Amino acid sequence: MGAGANNHEESSPLIPAAVAAPAYEKPPQAPAPEAANYYADGVPVVMGEPVSAHAFGGVPRESWNSGILSCLGRNDEFCSSDVEVCLLGTVAPCVLYGSNVERLAAGQGTFANSCLPYTGLYLLGNSLFGWNCLAPWFSHPTRTAIRQRYNLEGSFEAFTRQCGCCGDLVEDEERREHLEAACDLATHYLCHPCALCQEGRELRRRVPHPGFNNGHSVFVMMPPMEQTMGRGM
């Protein structure tokens, strides 16, 4: 009886049949957002840390803003500055070199510490050998520093890209850098005034002059106004 009653209750139409709950399907998870890539001085930065070119499979290097033979630069907002750079490179390369170093490594006495040795080597080379053969040896590391800081394409890499040869040398970062440094030296010896002018045009488009106070605000203290004591009524 008990078993029959239980079976009758289970089969009664008044008791709703138990419905199996549908299996809960976990919604697909959205892919984690990739870290934003930013660029600092021409080198990609992930999560605030600069990474090497190998981490991204080779970072394409930028071209110089103007060619080495573009004496008057480009017809843009820096046109007057390009003319000034051309005149300095022709008449007073020591001043142009000192200005380039001052923009590249701003600091007290940077201009004098670079301009004066360059002037001495310039005069010594012209006096002993009849041409400026000593100052390029002194100034070519600046070109290497500009190229590395702003991730610019070097002369050797540009040559291999145009000719399609020596690709293995470009892939080897250390060997490529040695070859680029040698090309920087050769560029200064063969086209020294043009190399200085190209570096000057590049730096003036990227770095403001240190004399502009680098954008810091200047507070001027005004003297107090004269105060007079009046006689009360």
UniProtKB/Swiss-Prot annotation:
Membrane topology, from the record: Multi-pass membrane protein
Location(s) in or outside the cell: Membrane
Listed InterPro entries: PLAC_motif_containing
Tissue: Expressed in roots, coleoptiles, leaves, stalks, apical meristems, immature ears, embryos, endosperm, pericarp, silks, tassel spikelets and pollen. Highest expression in the pericarp and stalks.
Keywords for this protein: Membrane, Transmembrane, Transmembrane helix
Transmembrane portions of the chain: 85-101, 115-138
Domain of life where this protein originates: Eukaryota
GO cellular component, one term: membrane
Pfam families: PLAC8
Family: Belongs to the cornifelin family.
Record-given protein name: Cell number regulator 8
Phylogenetic lineage: Eukaryota, Viridiplantae, Streptophyta, Embryophyta, Tracheophyta
Gene transcribed to yield this protein: CNR8
